[in-house]
């Protein structure tokens, strides 16, 4: 069953996988790494444009490493999750200095780099260096869960290990990069989270979820993410044509980004804080100022 799955997948990839992406088939580890970091928490359609912008602006790791942090952050603007960008820049500097700009070709060395986890390390190792390491992302987990009829939660420790071992056992060790790309593309275009194309699926005869009517029930997730509400009040200080901004301190996801004066309150009944008024007075000096409020808005 496992061998047949792999054979059919590779056959589908060669004949029917028409998914096009600018990094697909790439063997340059720098470009593969860049694409994988951009695609973390980002849809392919959005990441495509940013990938091309980064490659055009920073053709090599040395180019990225030499760039000022503000320049890199500006190019990243709009993607969110700026920790990815910070790690990307830090790792580029490390590779430029430690490896003289040559991306490490050993899986464990790749995995040790800042901002790179098992999935990204496996992607780089298999796509760039043809090393036999299976990638396991949400697409892969979904395909495996449905095909084998597995109801172990994909986000549980035992589930993560189970899907990793299963993916490794299916891996075509002669062409791991092709297998990995095929698995991800199959999950993204055929075995989709919603409205999967079971009617054209080459695996449906052996797919346990299809045969037993479990498709909409798999995969299973253990955790339900709890949304946290935060209330921010921003103070936009204008003087003529100038606007005051400052670099954010601290170690949160927005560290080193620029912002207006910010006060975070415990509830939405926010009010002007005395310390904030003093801060504004320090900025504007003896000049007269007034505070005008605007309607609140929700950001999710």
Residue ranges of predicted features:
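Catalytic cores of DNA base-excision repair glycosylases
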Residues: 2-199, 203-217, 229, 287-289
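Short, Lys/Arg-enriched, disordered terminal segments
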Residues: 1-7, 268-273
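The catalytic Nudix box helix
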Residues: 256-298
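Short, solvent-exposed loop/turn elements at beta->coil junctions and helix N-caps
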Residues: 221-224, 294-300
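A short glycine-/small-residue-rich loop at the edge of a beta-strand within enzyme catalytic domains
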Residues: 192, 226, 267-271
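Structured beta->alpha junctions
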Residues: 27, 43, 128, 249-250, ...
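N-terminal strand-loop-strand
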Residues: 216-263
